[in-house]
Amino acid sequence: MIYQMQMPEKIDVDEGTHNDKNGIFIAQPLERGYGVTLGNAMRRVLLASLPGTAITGIKIDGVFHEFSAIDGVREDVPDIILNLKKVRFRSSTKRSCKTTVTVDGPADVTAGDIVAQEGEFEVLNTDLHIATVNEGSRLSMDVYIGRGRGYVPAEDNRGDGMPLGFIAIDSIFTPIKNVKFSVENTRVGQRTDYEKMILDVETDGSVSPDDSISLAGKIINEHVSLFANFSPTDEEFTEEEYKQQDDEFENMRKMLLTRIEDLDLSVRSHNCLRLAEIDTLGDLVSRKEDELLTYKNFGKKSLTELKEQLEKFELKFGMDITKYQMKG
């Protein structure tokens, strides 16, 4: 039997400060110590684990490295990158995409000039300054946009198959601008040693404060449920079961070594994979769908064809194959 603990019946909302970007949420009453426990967990998950959309890289015409100056543009490349990191998006898709920005001077380039080609995203801070183009000059650049969680450094955005001149940049995917919490004493009956946890959330507008704390709570719950459902077992594997596991492991390893040219694929898909240096099934399943769609000439038709092939092997994209020690 678990000792009955004092818990909140619901989360209260401070309606006076509540809007699309800001929210103050109050959980009470809590047992002593649980204000900090819950506040810390929610704050960490909100800042680091919620998905969002950000720019992952750029390619500027006539520029081949990130420390260049651009003829006819007041800002140099590092300044432009710093400005692009601040662009905030609301996205309607989970896949990566690319759009082209071309501006002739004299002009002030803003985040509003980054326009989705197929409605994949919406720029929220359209007035954000990106660059200044002088009269008679032009700024033309490809902007690569992706989905992710938290903060991702530039080196992790350098994927295979990117064009010459591609410059990866740090991505701030988190839609949360700021989170803080405080803990105060509160009364239940005659006792005054219970706690009230006040959570103050500010988002960039791509997600509401209500949805953000709901998602953070679900992420925490998914992890904690592993402990709640834990049941130790004394089950032991027989020698035959161990042998079966070894055989399954070896069969999977051999399957992942299957050469791409041995698959029944179209010439277009074969060529796309060859250019991306994807030689085996193992190379293919370790890639994510979003990554494949960034490769040159690789579209949804090729992706559907590859999915059908993987289903025949009972495989899928985004698999972790490190334990199979793939070689050659």
UniProtKB/Swiss-Prot annotation:
SUPFAM superfamilies: C-terminal domain of RNA polymerase alpha subunit, Insert subdomain of RNA polymerase alpha subunit, RBP11-like subunits of RNA polymerase. Its EC number is 2.7.7.6. The keyword Transcription applies. Keywords: DNA-directed RNA polymerase, Nucleotidyltransferase, Transcription, Transferase. Residues 252-328 are annotated as: Alpha C-terminal domain (alpha-CTD). One of its GO terms (cellular component) is DNA-directed RNA polymerase complex. Residues 1-231 are annotated as: Alpha N-terminal domain (alpha-NTD). The N-terminal domain is essential for RNAP assembly and basal transcription, whereas the C-terminal domain is involved in interaction with transcriptional regulators and with upstream promoter elements. This is DNA-directed RNA polymerase subunit alpha.
